């Protein structure tokens, strides 16, 4: 999948799940499952419930995403 095909949207982490998975409530009200991108994992950036994040969604499956940025 090319980088151009992704949908970027902001949301808030509502719950942490095993294996670095998170439930994220998006700005449009939808709740999705998201995993952490490799760069965030590599730099040991902690993500906790209540954090504002940017999520990349695939146009093919809008229920799963990848967390690419955590706002300070």
Curated annotation (Swiss-Prot):
The keyword RNA-binding is annotated on this UniProt entry: yes
GO molecular function: ribosome binding; rRNA binding; translation initiation factor activity
GO cellular component term, pick one: cytosol
CDD domains for this protein: S1_IF1 (cd04451)
Keywords, in A-Z order: Cytoplasm, Initiation factor, Protein biosynthesis, RNA-binding, rRNA-binding
Coiled-coil annotated residue ranges, if any: none
Localization terms from the record: Cytoplasm
Keyword Kinase: no
Residue ranges occupied by any S1-like domain in the UniProt entry: 1-72
Function summary: One of the essential components for the initiation of protein synthesis. Stabilizes the binding of IF-2 and IF-3 on the 30S subunit to which N-formylmethionyl-tRNA(fMet) subsequently binds. Helps modulate mRNA selection, yielding the 30S pre-initiation complex (PIC). Upon addition of the 50S ribosomal subunit IF-1, IF-2 and IF-3 are released leaving the mature 70S translation initiation complex.
Self-association state and partner proteins as the record states: Component of the 30S ribosomal translation pre-initiation complex which assembles on the 30S ribosome in the order IF-2 and IF-3, IF-1 and N-formylmethionyl-tRNA(fMet); mRNA recruitment can occur at any time during PIC assembly.
Family, similarity comment: Belongs to the IF-1 family.
Protein name as it appears in the record: Translation initiation factor IF-1
Protein species of origin: Lacticaseibacillus paracasei (strain ATCC 334 / BCRC 17002 / CCUG 31169 / CIP 107868 / KCTC 3260 / NRRL B-441) (Lactobacillus paracasei)
């Amino acid at each position: 999948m090319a980088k151009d095909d992704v949908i970027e949207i902001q949301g808030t982490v509502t719950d942490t799940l095993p294996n670095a998975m998170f439930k994220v409530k998006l700005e449009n009200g939808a709740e999705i499952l998201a995993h952490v991108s490799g760069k965030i994992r590599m730099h040991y950036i902690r993500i906790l419930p209540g954090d504002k994040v940017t999520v990349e969604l695939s146009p093919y499956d809008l229920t799963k995403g990848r967390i690419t940025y955590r706002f300070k």
